[in-house]
Amino acid sequence: MTELVGRTRARCVETLSLDSTGTRNALSAALVAELSAALAECGKDPDVRAVVLTHTGTTFCAGADLRDPPDPDALVALLRQLIELPRPVVARVTGHVRAGGLGLLAACDLAAASATASFAFTEVRIGVAPAVISLPLLPRTDPRALARYYLTGERFDPAEAVRLGLLTVTADDVDEALAPVLDGLRRSAPQALAETKRLLTARVLETFDRDAASLTALSARLFSTDQAREGMTAFLERRDAAWVV
């Protein structure tokens, strides 16, 4: 069976690489399950000080796999797992991030992207809403600034992602930018990192507790509609949806 998540370790930092380039690292049921299992192991391993979440290929994550979508509850659980993991999680992006991939990005504690990265909330263009991924996104960003991209599906660049609060830093050389960050995490006490992360994520988890059930239901309802079926079919057939004017 092909592994969908690569794993390496260097000086107590575990790197998890989304490795399903044939689907542009789309969130399939299998990839979500494998990533969740890897995170669970990292959370229990005392030799893991921090986790880097990155990717192979030119796309960090294309969002949900429309041919093999994950269960909405499983996606909520994965996002919550990233937030509750007692290790800092650092996103390292050198490519495109779309739709559900932005949920992964928002669930990480820190995020860095190279100048080649691009971002888009493409849900509205296939007839649905960025429902489940709003759980980590809206508490960590400026909703007013985010509204343009939520409502239009426009692409935006790393500098704009920093302004919105999606990214911590952008640089031509993302590894050079992350080097002092990872060094700082290696110098920090494990219990201090865990408790400091709890302080930083408390408000995000309140949103999960309050809204996860309703947003999961909204997502399921929207994906079952005629407009969503048309939008997904149009996407797979590489044509405009019927409502485009």
PLM-predicted stretches and their roles:
Residues 149-150, 161, 199, 203, ...:
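Helix-loop "lid/cap" segments that line or gate small-molecule binding pockets
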Residues 134-144:
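Hydrophobic, secondary-structure "cap" segments at the distal end of domains
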Residues 82-126, 158:
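Glycine-rich beta-to-alpha active-site loop
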Residues 1-56, 179:
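Conserved CoA-thioester-binding segment of acyl-CoA-metabolizing enzymes
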Residues 47, 54-82, 207:
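Glycine- (often His-adjacent) and acidic-residue-rich active-site loop
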Residues 95, 109-110, 148, 152-154, ...:
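Well-ordered beta-strand positions
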Residues 112-117, 167-213, 226, 242-245:
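C-terminal long alpha-helix characteristic of the crotonase
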